[in-house]
Amino acid sequence: MRVLLSNDDGVHAPGLKALADAFEGDEVWVVAPDREQSASSHAISLHRPLRLFEMAPRWYAVDGTPTDAVYMGLNHVLRGARPDVVVSGINHGPNLGNDVLYSGTVAAAMEGALLGVHALAVSLACSPPHVFDEAARFAVALARRVVATQPPAPLLLNVNVPRGPVRGYRFTRLGRRTYGNEVVEKTDPRGRKYYWIGGEGGPTNEDIPGSDCNCVLGEGLVAVTPLHLDSSHDAVLQGLRSWTVPGYEKEPAL
């Protein structure tokens, strides 16, 4: 099995190393950001050149975002030798609920799916200290299942693994997490103001049965959540079709 690994914690992150070690015996390629890129979402570098550094055989760093790294991996490093699966992670912390909108880990996997390759985003959903062995083993087992099944369309799975031995898993939907809206204002030694967004403390998780948040944080199970590349809101679309905008002609729905 040919595997492309990436992440958003950077090419030297221990979660990435644990994932590469767990795929021992497979053809593993690593193309990852050269530094920490957490919460970079799906940013891509279109207005500056990228640099690619070969750190070791089949192990590359890109001075860009997680999306840049996977794009470079599929369209340059592995051009003509398409991988069977892209795996992003292991993230140092959870990517649950609306975290996926901000996550560079999820974005790296999503870029793989957008480019036609089955992809997994894998996160260790706990605070430090991080021990990645169980999450890495589960990721490998799930990746093998995906490759063996070969779904007809590129599959994108968001995986969150709790701390400790894996005692079970569940296929889930996304939950909802609420973060603080505080903006903390401070002053640097030169008298200039600077700001931290989000404030202090962790998120509040809504109690939604069947959600990834409940599964991981409430029950201690691995959550595997399929994500969809089409962000259209079909239920709202049906309602909008009855609207009229004054002064403009509405064309028939297709």
Curated annotation (Swiss-Prot):
It is an enzyme of class 3 (hydrolase). A divalent metal cation binds at D8, D9, S38, N91. Its cofactor is a divalent metal cation. The keyword RNA-binding does not apply. The keyword Membrane does not apply. Binds 1 divalent metal cation per subunit. It comes from the Bacteria. Disulfide bonds: none annotated. One of its GO terms (molecular function) is 5'-nucleotidase activity. Keywords: Cytoplasm, Hydrolase, Metal-binding, Nucleotide-binding. InterPro entries: SurE, SurE-like_Pase/nucleotidase, SurE-like_sf. Belongs to the SurE nucleotidase family. Nucleotidase that shows phosphatase activity on nucleoside 5'-monophosphates. This is 5'-nucleotidase SurE. It comes from Anaeromyxobacter sp. (strain Fw109-5). The lineage of its organism: Bacteria, Pseudomonadati, Myxococcota, Myxococcia, Myxococcales. The gene is surE.
